[in-house]
């Protein structure tokens, strides 16, 4: 038994067209279209076929999902570079994970959300907000090793999401679940230096924009503010200015290792702080490109893995003694995708 809205949600989360799904389950596209628009009860054998085709347990189709449009930090500049179908896949997957998170949190407590909402104004710039937020959260001005842990301590759930081919242009986004829990989703296929930057970029949106009542500010302005916020958060002016002053090309690898940001971002920040001039920054960027480092830089940057989702799932499997089958039924997600959210760093003891 099920409702059509969930069939559409499941189908779009897999990037499958009506025609493709209809062929997989042996019905006409017209019949499937009617099913997706219907509130009528659907026969169990057909739902089982659809579940197999879309890789969802039967319980998924009985869940009640919030059908309102997701309020996220995915602003126009990012949307403009992505195909509509790819965006739909990401949004639907996030909608499904958000529901699972809310369900898990019925039995688990996480740190209280403690990041304040701060309005960015002409008098109160994004870099000043980043500086004050770090002081408020007692995050040191030195390079931040366990940066994900520092954000999760503030009650923000971080999720490294495996996107695949549909999300090569997707960096990350911030959203709230139906019950009001903030989640930052990041593309797990990105290099770690980009993950670190995009994490703090999203914290900037969460601080300055996601709860703002200012409807006049353009999305381009918001992106610029989030970039400036991330720059000050990751490379604080007062601390990094000595390292970036008269920065030479040969310094980039060492500074990347120290500050755990990309070489391109170091060049950008050095120019932003007037530590190097326009011509020097252009020369550095060109040299990176010639060395094949425009898309994939040399030099390893570490990043810690998110732990809140891992612990939430682990508590259900271990402390609350759910079997994987029971958890899959409760969340409406297949076991392999639960394990993906659980993370591969820890062994599953069930």
Residue ranges of predicted features:
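Active-site hotspot residues in diverse enzymes, especially metal/ion-binding acidic/histidine motifs
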Residues: 1-350
